[in-house]
């Protein structure tokens, strides 16, 4: 197995940590399941109560700079200990995070500017202490932490921490139930192997948001909101493998963030964005696969039952929120009896959607999908990339040239589907699939060609107009990349 690659340019001291979300429906039962896993059952555990107050300015200047600042009260035995911690943003968006971390004991729960200036990059963040003067509490977390130390034969040491409690911001609160694996010594591969051992018994979801990020989202009223696409920035001359890593990682982040939200949110848009995220990810893998043949993608078959539930739930949500409502006035026409019948009709897809949402959530409590997603996290980190200090390989075409060929090939596949269109359900389905693959490929390579993408191929558009399968896809079929 290839080793997990960790960038060497991260600030020191740094924290290398894997965050995993756990179901919140039965925390006590879940804790018992964690305790009896074969990895942890015979190891000594330590329980600690933690209360953390996070600080920022009213306009959240620290958050804008990717900085989290907290004071932690730690109660274990004897006198409570207080720690002031500053964390800086590192490899964001992934459950595997590498962040700068500076933590020191303080005499009270008041912030210490002296310690900040002496032991952290505070001079760059706040050279004149104006930010410090404006700092105030913005949210808190308090939870019970159970920790185990796992020492391996390869000399690596990993701290496994189970956190169960809540996040509070003003009058808002949200449950907190997660597992953290922190690498204390050794190679990051240890995190992968230990996490996989636990994932075989416990339903886990990779968690790309830190506690501080969730605290900010809670304060804003946006916790577990739908996460939309945020296309990764790629450049025309960057190596293809680097672009693939950046693009796939962003799409996987969207997918897993919406799965996490789906466990507690009834918002139809969460379901929609989860399915969009998965389609974007699979389409991008199809786009970049020729350049990553040696990477050996995980087997994603374990996700099929879950994604079937998600797809069927999306169909029901569309029926009850988009397809049927416009017909209300035409059907009822002010007739009370017809209005009653119409309401009865609308209740059917709503009830079916409720049942299907429960099925999707039940699927997320099976360990198999989480284990597959966890494999994907580390697979993404193992993707080949060019070291920052290496010159580009002249034998490898840059992204723009490579992308032009790949998107051109997808154009040909779509054109072939349009030419073969017989008006059947199967042929129309094929056209929709090819069109969506092309759309997601163009989105993945956004920013590569000069100027604005959107050049039309008139012949393809004329064929599209003749095919009922492609209504609403104008502008997707004629985009090209490259000269």
Annotate each PLM feature.
Residues 2-483:
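Function-determining surface determinants
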């Amino acid at each position: 197995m290839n080793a997990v690659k960790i960038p060497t340019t991260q600030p020191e001291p740094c924290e290398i940590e894997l965050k995993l979300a756990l179901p919140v429906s039965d925390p006590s039962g879940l804790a018992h399941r964690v305790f009896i896993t074969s990895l942890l059952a015979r190891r000594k555990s330590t329980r600690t109560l933690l209360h953390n107050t996070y600080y920022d300015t009213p306009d959240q200047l620290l958050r804008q700079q990717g900085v989290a600042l907290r004071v932690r009260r730690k109660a274990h035995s004897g006198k409570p200990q207080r720690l002031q911690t500053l964390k800086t943003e590192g490899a964001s968006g992934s459950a595997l995070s590498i962040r700068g971390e500076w933590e020191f004991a303080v005499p009270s729960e008041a912030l210490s500017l002296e310690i900040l200036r002496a032991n952290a990059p505070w001079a760059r963040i706040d050279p004149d202490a104006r930010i410090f003067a404006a700092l105030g509490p913005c949210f808190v977390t308090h939870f019970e932490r159970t920790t185990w130390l796992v020492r391996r034969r390869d000399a690596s040491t990993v701290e496994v921490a189970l956190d169960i409690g809540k996040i509070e911001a003003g009058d808002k609160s949200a449950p907190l139930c997660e597992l953290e694996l922190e690498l204390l010594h050794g190679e990051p591969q240890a995190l992968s192997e230990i996490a996989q051992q636990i994932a075989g018994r416990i339903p886990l979801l990779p968690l790309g948001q830190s506690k501080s990020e969730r605290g900010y989202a809670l304060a804003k009223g946006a916790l577990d909101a739908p996460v939309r696409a945020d296309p990764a920035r790629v450049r025309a001359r960057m190596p293809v493998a680097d672009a693939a890593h950046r693009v796939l990682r962003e799409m996987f982040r969207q997918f897993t963030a919406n799965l996490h939200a789906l466990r507690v949110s009834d918002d139809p848009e969460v379901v929609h964005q989860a399915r969009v995220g998965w389609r974007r990810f699979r389409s991008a893998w199809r786009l970049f696969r020729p350049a990553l043949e040696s990477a050996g993608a995980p087997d994603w078959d374990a996700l099929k039952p879950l994604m079937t539930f998600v797809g069927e739930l999306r169909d029901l949500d569309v029926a009850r929120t988009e397809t049927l409502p416009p017909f209300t006035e035409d059907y009822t026409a002010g007739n009370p009896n017809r209005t009653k019948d119409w309401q009865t009709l609308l209740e059917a897809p709503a009830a079916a959607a409720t049942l299907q949402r429960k099925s999707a959530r039940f699927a997320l409590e099976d360990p198999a999908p989480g284990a597959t997603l966890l494999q994907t996290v580390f697979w993404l980190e193992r993707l080949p990339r060019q070291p920052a200090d290496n010159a580009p390989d002249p034998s490898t075409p840059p992204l723009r040239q490579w992308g032009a060929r790949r998107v051109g090939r997808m154009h040909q596949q779509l054109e072939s589907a349009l030419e073969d269109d017989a008006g059947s359900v199967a042929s129309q389905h094929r056209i929709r699939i090819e069109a969506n693959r092309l759309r997601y490929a163009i989105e993945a390579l956004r920013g590569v060609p000069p100027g604005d993408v959107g050049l039309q191929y008139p012949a393809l558009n004329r064929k599209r107009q003749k095919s009922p399968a492609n209504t609403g896809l104008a502008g997707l079929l004629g985009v090209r990349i490259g000269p």
